[in-house]
C-alpha cells in the first residue's frame, strides 16, 4: 500500500496538561512500542496520543476526568521508569491491582484507553491519528476506496492503491436519493393510522397504507438524516455515531442480569442500535434469507421426529400461528421492494419459491471460494448468501461497488436497500404521510372501552397527543415491550397486551460464537466487499440433520463473511495474546490480512424466564424506568454452539488455517437480532398479539417487528420482519391476504 494524498487535519485542540500529556505519551508508547521487522513507529509517532488528547477536548470530553484520575494513579514518575517497571505498572492497571482507585475502575479505564489508542492508530488521518497513513500501511489496509475489482478479491492478490483523497469521498451534499425534506407535523390532527417508529417496519407499513388511501402520521424518536451516515470513515463508523442516532439509546440504556437472583446493571450493545429516520435499515448488513418451512412449526415438527422429551423442559418453544405458505407471497413482495440478489436453488434446504431472485448473487470472493471448496469436501452444500444489495441497476439504484464500508454504514451508491431508497421517499410524495422526527412517544392512549385511540409524545416544543383510528407500534423489541408496559389505563392496570402477564416474556437474542482462523503467509483481502458477500452452509441449520444422541435440538448457519476494518479488527485477539506490547503489535501487523471469521448464527430457543420488564432501580432522563433484560442461554444452546464451533473448526482446518480460536458461547444480552417480548399466537393466554400483530386485549392496537417472533431461527430476521409487516398492513388496509 503506497501513501495517499495527505489528509491534513484541522489544528487539534488539547485537553490534558503538560504532565498528563507526558504520562499519556509514555503509556501509549509502551502499549504500542516502536520496533519489529521492518520497524514500525510507536504510538506517539503515529499520532495516537495526539488523537486521544484532542478527542478529550471534543467528542470524548466526558472521559477527561477519568483520564486525569487514572493517569495520576499510574504516577508521574512513569515516563522515567525503566521499560520493565513500566510494563509491570501497565499489567497492574489492566488487572486492576494498582493501589488505587478501585479495581473495576482501573480495568474499565484500561479498556477505554485501549479502545481510544486503537482508534488513534488506525483512524482516518483527518481525525489526527494514523499520521501519514502509517497505521494503515503497516497492516496493508488501502483506506477508503469507492470500490474494488474482482481480481483484487482473489486470494493472495496484492492491492496497491493509495487511499482516496478525502475531498473525493462521498459527502451528504453529493449523495443520491436522499429523501425529500421531512413534512413535519406541527399541529397534531387525527389520522387514520398512527405509526410509532420510523424504521424499516414503520416505513414499509406507511408506504403500503398511503398507497391504499390512508392518512398516516409516523412518529420517529430520532433525528432525520442528511447523508452523513454514508461517509467512508470507520471512526464515524456506524451512522449511529455520525448523526447522533445513539442519543435516545444513551438516555435509556437497558440493564441486564442472567437470572432473577442477580442485580441488573447497565449494558451497552457491542453493535450500534440506531434511533433515526429509517432505523437500522441504513446501517444493516443486508443478509436477506427466508425462514425454512419447519421454522414455523418448530415444536410440532421436533416432537414428531424426536418426541416431546427432546424439547428442553424449561423452554417455551411453540409453533408459529401461521405457515410458510401464508407468508410466501409477502416474502416475494419484500424481496421485490428491496431488490434481493441471490441464486434460487443454491441452498438445497430453502423453502419453495414462486420465482427466481431479481438478480444474480454478489460475486464470490477468494475467501468465499476457499470456504466453499473446503465445506464441499466436508460434505456440506455451500451457497451464496441472498442479500438486499444490488448486483445490477434496479429502480434508480446502482450496483454494488464492493467497497469496504457496508455494514454499519449507509451505502454511497444505494446498492444496499434501506427505508430511504425503497419506500420512504415514495410514501411521502402525495402528502398522505405526515412525519414527526424527534418525537419520543410516552404512552399509548386508550378510551373507556379499552381500545387504543392515540398516543402521547414529547418533542422539543413540549408534550402532545396524536389521535388515530388505528395505532401501530413498530419500534425495536425493547421499546415495543417498554411502551406497552408504560401505557396503563383503567382497563389495563398491568399495561397494554399484558392482561395475562405475557409482555416481555420469551426474549431471544442472537449469540455470535464465531471461529477465527489465521492463514499465515496468505493475503485474504477481507477488507474488500460487504459483509453479506458470503458463502454459507445450512446443512447444520434447523432440523436439516439427525439430532438423535446429540443432546440438543435445532441448529445454526456457518458463513465466511467479508468486511474487516482495522479499528475493530485490532481488538480481535486469540486467547493468551496480550493486548499491549511488542507481541500485540507484531501479531496484528502480521495477522490483519491473514485472518478470516467463520460466523456462526445459532438458533436460540425461547424461555419464559428470559424476559424484558421495567427496571425499578434505573430510569431515563425523563424519570421513566428503562428496560431490564433477564437473559442467559441454556444447556441446549451451549451444546449446539460447541457442535457448530467444532464443525466450523473442521472447515477452517480444511481451508488451511494455521491458527484457530473461538469466541465464548454467550456473547451478550443484546445483538442486532433481538426478538420476542410481544409473542404472536392464537391463544390470548399465552401470547400478546395474533398472527397479524393485533393486540389481544387492546382493540385498535397492532405491534409489529421482531418482538412478535415465536422463535429465533438460524436466519437473519429482517426479511421475515418485513414480510410480516406487509401482511399486517394489508389487513389494516382492509385487503384480503395475498395467496
Regions found by a protein language model. Give the residues of each.
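Mature-region segments of soluble proteins
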Residues: 6-10, 18-26, 30-177
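Extreme N-terminal leader/targeting segments of oxidoreductases
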Residues: 134, 146, 153, 160-193, ...
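N-terminal Rossmann-like FAD-binding beta1-loop-alpha1 element of flavoenzymes
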Residues: 191-218
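Glycine-rich loop(s) and the adjacent beta-strand/alpha-helix scaffold that form part
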Residues: 211, 215-217, 221-236, 430, ...
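Conserved redox-cofactor binding core of oxidoreductases
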Residues: 242-243, 250, 260, 264, ...
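FAD cofactor-binding and catalytic pocket of flavoenzymes
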Residues: 259-261, 265-273, 277-284, 288-304, ...
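A glycine-rich dinucleotide-binding beta-alpha-beta segment and adjacent secondary-structure elements
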Residues: 384-390, 399-406, 442-445, 593-604, ...
